Amino acid sequence: EIAQCLVGSEMCIRDRPVPYALAPAENFAMGGVALLTALGNVQEISFGSECGDIRLLSQAAEACRVCKTDYADVMDDFLRSGYSYPEVLSQMVGQLYGAETAAVLRHPNNTLAIAYLNAIHEMDSPLRPMTIQRRGAGHNSSQPGPDGTASATYIRQFFADGGDCRRMMPSYAWHALREAQQAGHVASMSYLERLILYKLRTTDPDELHDIAEIGQGLEHRLYKAKRSASLEELLQTIRTKRYPMARLRRILLHILLDIRTADIQNYPAYGRILAFNDTGREILKDSKEKRLLPFSHSLAELAHTSPTAGRCAALESQATDIYQLARPVIGQGESDFRRKITISGGTHHAAPESQS
């Protein structure tokens, strides 16, 4: 599947370490911006958005920064009253900057775009941002758009239900997905249900308190709900207005993988290269003397660069091992340290160990 990404015009594929890949928008974006900046020779970063207007997104990003710094106490008061964070932020931005700016915050791709812009600002990164407007179906749309495009949410569910979604994605992506399905490599969280329930039943509230994204007493709600007999029952028991379902699913994976708040608060300790083509090779070669972090395809090599890197590498390896249990056909453990890099270009092509 990684090789198919190179076919799809990706020049160099680097791995966002699992603590950041599973993190909320702010930390997810921070991880991406930090890694691109650390290469030392990347000038631009692009991301999707519903509005497609970098000026408006930049204004919304500034508004969010002002609200979080200058009006933090006011926000905390509203949050303690039971309002959700997006609601409070949108209301405050609207009052301070107007309805047009506040409206930007109501769309998920805009929210991630704002997180990228704020990460660039926080790090004083030289990256120049640009945005590509999302067209067709919305981010979480349950139906294809008028032009036939579909959201990833819809495609995943449609495919899981046995639907033929070849017209909803590039042909190379469809073939890769079909091959993975036929090999029993399409993962599902349903295969992790017993593991998650076991982990929750054997973790005390003090340990839960340190898990990423848990706060405001959620550890006690989780602990009380540990008797749940299914993930669905568990999620319905702990769900609140302040904790939407998407965040709760992330938190359950944080618990399973032992990803803690400290793991997502700092910048990534390394950059892992999964694949590259000829152009990507030149980018990596040019960056060699300019890098601010260690970059390598070898997780074992990266793990020894610092204690923080060792912790992150252990989390990555563990996540891959658990991922292998989330497939219809269980994969071998300890595969992450043996993964081979994929090189596409000319006649040289090295396939990675099979993994979806």
Please place each PLM-identified region on the residue numbering.
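Active-site cores that bind ATP or allylic diphosphates and position pyrophosphate for catalysis
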Residues: 17-356
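Single conserved hydrophobic/aromatic residue that forms the stacking wall/gate
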Residues: 1-8, 12-15
